[in-house]
């Protein structure tokens, strides 16, 4: 049976880009390394590990090989050691422009070069020894202050971001990391950027860009003056403090942002737990009690719904649905059936969830009719970043079409209407399907797309034609897939 996974810290994976805009690559053949790749794929992903000896050095492990980067005394570099040795220890020296310098700890030389001419033999730092850190994780997450154990969220009333939330509940807890001029910005759900003085601004100006630093698997954000973001004062306002070295106060975890949804029943009222433990369709507005965290089990593809009151929906006696379970079990798992703009939910007793005359939900139906259909709306992705098997979705230069194999990503705006979503891109143009299934991004009118949450962290997008959007060898986004699998699934 699946285990609870409400708070999953993301493993920080990244690529290293040299001055020639090429990624450090670990090859399977001969365990050689080069800097020839133009984009961030499987062979270009690295994981930072702390030195087992508790020193200041770190280890670079290839994500796909599981082997460690090493530098010998004569400067030769490879990625062949499956257990870290002395030559695998590097010091990371952050530079003022946000880039890293990697120095061999035992030999004191600097690592760099171009294409297949990489070495760790330089005695001085030149542009060839400078590396840009490019995160390989999905850039939308929750940010948890390590010292306060509180989540960062946007406080509209105070016009600030603060680390004061017990739970990352609602859309205001979503943070999007924006890669900008070799640094990262923190973008709130309303598209503003956090400046180091705590103010929120509409443009990614210099004081809203941060260098990433890693310490014991945690993240720190250094501003252009060399100070670090931290929660400040009783309210936990996020701004740059006085410290020029990261302590526990300046460290953060990135946690996976699971989809949070609201559901509307046939009576056009929101499903809620506001009036007690019974899950009922009896509210006219969507607030915390009407929001549910939805998790999909990777094995069964069934889902759970977790409420703001701290309980999972669970099947109880006589088919009732209550938000009282504290652990995931068979009775908390629901199978989703996709019916165009609506969904049906089948409980563990094999029956469909329906709305009774008093508004309460119960799994007592053998067939799907009007009372068994619900509108499901994703509320915590007003900004949408999509990543497929080959990379991120991004506007194609000089074209109205969309690439699906990029290392960088575009942030799209999402709106919702009657069970369907509308996607708006750069310049305010809407997505629409053109000839032969091509997806274009300069529409004057919004076209409806259906979202189907098929796997944990992945969705399928269905066009009006009934076909699913997919990537592929051409690198173009097309609406021509028959099934929501493989290239037609998107991390969001």
From Swiss-Prot:
CDD domains referenced in this protein's UniProt entry, alphabetically: beta-trefoil_FSCN2_rpt1
Domain of life assignment: Eukaryota
Gene Ontology process terms (BP): actin cytoskeleton organization; actin filament organization; eye photoreceptor cell development
Keywords in alphabetical order: Actin-binding, Cell projection, Cytoplasm, Cytoskeleton
GO cellular component: actin cytoskeleton; cytosol; stereocilium
Molecular function, one GO term: protein-macromolecule adaptor activity
Principal subcellular localization: cytoplasm
Expression across tissues: Expressed in the inner ear. Abundant in the utricle.
Effect on the protein of changing residue 109 to H: In prebycusis phenotype
Subcellular locations according to the entry: Cytoplasm, Cytoskeleton; Cell projection, Stereocilium
Disease named in the record: Defects in Fscn2 lead to hair-cell degeneration in the inner ear and are a key contributor to the early-onset, age-related hearing loss (prebycusis) phenotype when in combination with waltzer cadherin 23 mutant.
Known role: Acts as an actin bundling protein. May play a pivotal role in photoreceptor cell-specific events, such as disk morphogenesis. Important for maintaining functional hair-cell bundles in the inner ear. May stiffen the longer stereocilia of hair-cell bundles in the inner ear enabling better force transmission to tip links.
Family named by the database record: Belongs to the fascin family.
Name by which UniProt lists this protein: Fascin-2
Annotated organism of origin: Mus musculus
